[in-house]
Structures are given as C-alpha cells and as structure tokens.
Amino acid sequence: MSRVIKVTEQKMSPQAIEVRGARVHNLKDIDIDIPLGKLVGIAGVSGSGKSSLALGVLYAEGSRRYLEALSTYTRRRLTQAEHAQVDEVLHVPAALALHQRPSVPGVRSTFGTMTELNNSLRLLFSRCAHHVCPHCGARVEPSLNVAAGLSLTCPACGREFYAPSAEDLAFNSGGACPTCGGTGVMREVDEASLVPDESKTINEGAVLPWGTLMWDLMKQVAGEMGVRTDVPFNQLTPEERDIVFHGPAVKKHILYVPKNGEGATPLDFTYYNAVYTVENALAKVKDDKGLKRVARFLREGACRDCGGTRLSEAARQPQVCGINLAQAAAMTLGDAVEWVRGVPASLPPEMRPMATDICDSFLSVARRLVDLGLDYLSLDRAGATLSTGERQRVQLARVVRNRSTGVLYVLDEPSIGLHPANVDGLVGVMRDLVDDGNTVVVVDHDTRVLAEADYLVEMGPVAGAGGGSVIAAGTVDEVEQSQGSRIAPFLRAELKRLRPQVTDDEMFDQGHIRMATDAIHTVKPLEVDIPRGRLVAVTGVSGSGKTTLVLETLIPALKAQAAGERLPGHVRWVDAEGIGRANLIDATPIGANVRSTVATYADIHDELRRAFARTPEAKAAGYKAGAFSYNTGALRCPTCDGTGSISLDVQFLPDVEIICPACRGSRYAEAASHIHREGKDGSLLTLPQLMDMSVDEALDATVGLKKVQARLQTLHDLGLGYLTLGEPTPALSGGEAQRLKLASEMGRVQDDAVFVFDEPTIGLHPLDVQVLLSVFDGLVSKGATVIVIEHNLDLIRNADYVIDMGPGGGDAGGQIVCAGTPADIAACPKSVTGRYL
C-alpha cells in the first residue's frame, strides 16, 4: 500500500514593510517598500515629507499596533498614536523612535545616571572598595565577603559591620546628602532681590515678596512691629531693616481696611519677615509654575555639606584605587575609562575576576559613548545641561545596549550636533542595531550618514504642498544616477564654494572685535580677534569650548559693553567699538501654545484683519478688525475657542487631541466664511482660506497689501515659502524657528550688529544650506557681523573666517587651535575639523 507523503511548503518571511496609499500631512498617496533588516536612509529638502513617512507612517503604525496588543489597563498609561492616514501598512515590526529633541531630564539626572554608568560605578565601590569601619574609622581591605553578603571585621577594633550596598551609594536613594536631598544644589534667599528699589517706601511696595507671595496687609503688621512704612527704605535704621528681613514671628493686632475703604475689621495677624515669606512659599511649591514665582528671590549654589557631589558623607567614604565615588564621578568619561581599566590589577588576586566583570560592564557601555564623541562629559554633569545633540546620542547608545531584535528603529536626524569626526561612531551604532536583526530608518541630511545606507528613499521634489512624493529610491549608487534626485550631486561630492573668498589682506578692512578672557569651564585663558562685517564660523569637536566662548563669553561681554555695564567676571577686556547690538538667534521653539502661528509671529495677521475689516461685507455686518482675531474676536470658532483642535476625554484611554469638527482646524466660525476679499485673479478669498495657504501662495493672493507683501517676501527669501500662515510656531523645526526669528531683522542697516547662530543648519538639506548662506550674505551686505557655531562642512567651507577650537573635548580642548580662512584651517595639521575640509 502506497504511503501519501505530505509536503509542507515553507512560507517565505516578509522582506519589506509595504506602505500603500500614505497621505499623512503632505504625502501624495504614496506607495513604497522599506526593506526589513537593513539600514534605510530617508532624504529630502525641509518640509518634503521625510518625517511624515518615517514618523507619521512607519513609527506611528509600528508603535500603535504593538500598543493595541496590550491590555486596556496598560494602554491608558501610555501615550498612544492615532491611526495614520494610510490605506495599508504590511509587515511593520514593533517600532521605537529616537526623536530629534529628547526631553530635558529632571534635576536628579546626571550623565552617569542617564547612561547607567553610575550603576556599574556604585557596584564597583560597594564590592571592591576599602570600606571604613563605622565604629573606629579604620579602613578595611577589599574582601569577597561583601559580595557574599557577609560582615566585615575591622582589623583595628575587631568589631563587625556590613559594607554599604550599591543602593546605599546612590544619591537618588540611601546615599543622598541629607542637606540637599541628593540634588547637590542649595537654594537660599537672596536678600538683595527682596527690596530691589530702596527709594520706595514699604507702603509703595518696596518689599516685593509681601506684594507677590504674601497678603498685602503685611505692610500694616510691619508698622505695628515698629518699622516706618512711609519713608524710603534706604532711610530706615539698621534695627528697622533687621525687623523687615529677620524679625520674629509674633502676633500683632491690626485694623484691616479693605481697598474699597468700606468698613474696618480688627485682626490678629502673625508677622512674616521678608526672608521667611520666601522660605515659606518655597516650602509649599508643588510645581514648576509655583517655583517660577519664588525663583526670582532665590540664588542657587553648591550644597555646603556635600560640595555639590550629591552624596552623603557615608557614601563618600569607600575608596577604590585611592579615590571615592564622588571623585570618580567627577572624571570625564575618557578619564574614567582609563581609570576603570586599571582597577582589577589593584585588587587582591581572588577579587580580580569579579572586578573584571563589573569593569567590563562599565567599559562596554562607555565604548559606544566614546565612539559618539561624548568622552569629554563628566559623569556628574547635570542631565539638564546637556545639549539636544548630546541627549540624543545618550539615547542612541542606550538603545544599542539593549541588544533587542526584530524592532523598527526610527532615528530623526541623529547627526545633529555631531562633529564630522564622530560620524563613523554614529554609523557604527546603527550598524550594530542592524546586525542584531533590526531595521533602522534614519531621517538625515548629512551625506556621510546617507551614503552608508543599504537603501535610500528621497522625498520631494520641494517642500510643503509641492512635496510629498518619492522622487528617488534604491541603493546609494542608484540614487546617485537618478536624474530626478536633488541629493545626488551632494552624494557625489560635487562641492564648490558659493561665496567669493575674502583675501587675508582684506579680512579686517571693516574692523576688529577683540576679546581677552580668563579660564572658564574647560576654556583656557585666551585672546580672540574676530573680523567685523564677515561671516565667521566657530568650529571644533563637541565639548571643545565653542558654546562657552561665544554664548557664555562673547555675547554677554558685547551686551555689557554696549549698555555701559560691568563685563562678566571672566572677561578681562573687550574691544568692539561701534557694536551696539549682540543678537542670539537660537533654535528654541517660538511660543508656548498653539495660538502662536507663522502669521501672528511675522506681524502678518494684524494687517490681514485690517484688510478684511475694510471689505463691504465686513462693514455691512459691523465687523471691525478685532472681530477677525481667532484668539478673542467675535468670528473665532466657539467650539475650540480659536485653537483649531479640541481634547476628548475618553474613559479608560488617554485624552485624544482631534481637529475641531466645527471649524475643521481653521480656528474661525462659519460667519467668517461669508466675508470675502478679492485676490490677484479676481477670485474671492476668506481669511480662513488665506490662513490655510503657504507663504508663496499668499504672495499671489495678497496683491495690493504692501506691508503683507513685504513681510511675505522676507519669509520667502529666508527659504520659508512652504510654511502655511496658520501653522503653529511651536511645531516648527529648530532651523525654521531660527529663520523666522530673523524675519524682523532683514532689510535694516546692521553695521552696529553682531548676529550669533547656534548650529543654524540643524534640519537643513544641503540645498537649504545654500538658501541659508544667501540669508547670511544679506546680513553681511548690510554691515552685520555674523558668527556661526557650526559642524556643517558646507557652511564652514563658505565662511570668510574660521576659528577652530580644540584640539579635543573637555580638558583636552578650550584653546584656539587655529584661525583663518577655510583653506588655512584645512592646512593646519593640529585641526581635527581641517582634516574633513
């Protein structure tokens, strides 16, 4: 009898994430396959749809589907993405996104805790240290008893004790300094801030805390304490001043008369002196808003007991190789790596295997951080003081350490703030993720990062409504050969200088800005000479002192000199005759809420409201300009109060933010759609329709409105023509925010001005960098001195003058390595930046 043999066909595993009909933001119903298990780059000009594809489709669907598999109880505690506007996404893995702007950590976070390097250090100091006997203070040799949970015997007094555990050495737990609670910082009342204007009387509000933090009737109580309240504060006797600042909390009988003057009430009231008023308010603070009210009366300094180390005296006693935990945490990562490598050899032979395991765990984490160029950071550096790029690299290194597989990682511009010397380290981290069986999608503009991709997708061809299409896809070689690609010339390194080079003889023709400084942070004492009326790039590896030199020294010094005030303590002298303004144009978001839009920030909306108020329809309806305000006007949408969105409180689920169903995001009520103004081609437009247009579209639609046209043209010239007028400013990228802030400065004479930009190329495509260079040219042509802190090689190549800091980061930096034209820097053997020019 014949046997029937069943043959099971093995199903092929998916090879790609299949996206069909994606319409998120400006995506044009696109279909694209993203290879699985590869490093995939997404390129395109700013606003072309890169992030919409990577974050709005791939990450949104990958994370949402994973979360939907969890219980309702768990989901309600997590932020959930809504369904992406896409027909179908197949084979998308669970997704994690590393965003462009990681959140700023709290006051208890340090570089060591963020990277978990502190965990290894604490374990090392618990298991391998010379511990101190709590009975007689003698030191005990390292012993395996600690790891075994056994007691130690003091060789001096013979008594037994248990060594501290790793938890006992944590400043967020048992090892916290009792005085500062493990923050390393003490807040004390600044008495000088309590009475800022001593020419006022107490009745006139001389004692500020009594007016802002306490009942106003404290003035009357002070009078009952024997203080004259009707004479200028600077005429009070020392005894009276002491009562105001430090008087005892005694009850006084007063006759309280309300402000309306009707009736008087006898009261017994306890006197709160000015200092205690602030201390009492500080003790009751429950949130950041409350702290802001009190902060103006406080000064911060290192804790007097722990010296800013955050650790208790007991936690600072164990020693390894002659130093304690606080001293180890004060090292830079680079120094700590060298120190940790030498620890096992310093211990008894029987302890070396255990110490080696602990040290290896530290070194494996540290290796990636060093590769990413963070070796200059000290382990005790407060997490809140790290830059955006530094926080992003910490986040990236943490992800690699997890060694997960089958995950989709979406990285949003990980090269931000990264010196060219550290790009190889970044690529190595991404390759590690791919080698572990993950898919990495990286949105970036750095051609050195994009050139390493296994597969490249280019969005475009332009920004905004004209973008949202896939204009090239394939291997890097295939994209380089693509006729429609806009990134191809930059991948092929067809680079040329766009601005004429100023010769050495002409460089200082328009004058000098000179400054001499003492040491501050890691910057050594130095003298710097900056040419006026030029584009000057300040370069150097991360931590080399660029920010300290420019933002913490040059700008404050120029502002102080212009105002006739004292120079900062570390500035010896500054010579900048004729400089009246020093403007920092940074990448911080504009506005704190959705009510701030491109049109309101650029002073366009007010002019549009006046224009619509002049129309016959508005006059007939009785609408003045104020009625067209979406914040307070009669024509704002009553459902969303002019925000364009509403928040739904869904039981058992997180609040959901949706577009307002009444106005569909326009912010205006139905009545606003009945007021029209004639456009360029005779078409009739409403204000909500205009606010939904891009800057470039609005240029054609607002012919006849000279002020509006001038401001729109400025935005167009700044490369912001793709932004819609109603776009909320907090949602703009860092580069967009910088250029929008510049709008009010364009067109005026600038020969008394210095403009400082902190990494303005963040988020910019190489083509956008060319637009930015033309913006800088516009400022320089008006006489301005433009100083740019930058890593972008295209911008550095086009600078008139370069000041290169370094040679390394941290203690290995802080000096001017060389200064001159880009060609001079490229020829300088000591310059790390020069090697890449």
Pin down the residues of each PLM region:
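Conserved phosphate-binding elements of NTP-dependent enzyme cores
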Residues: 1-837
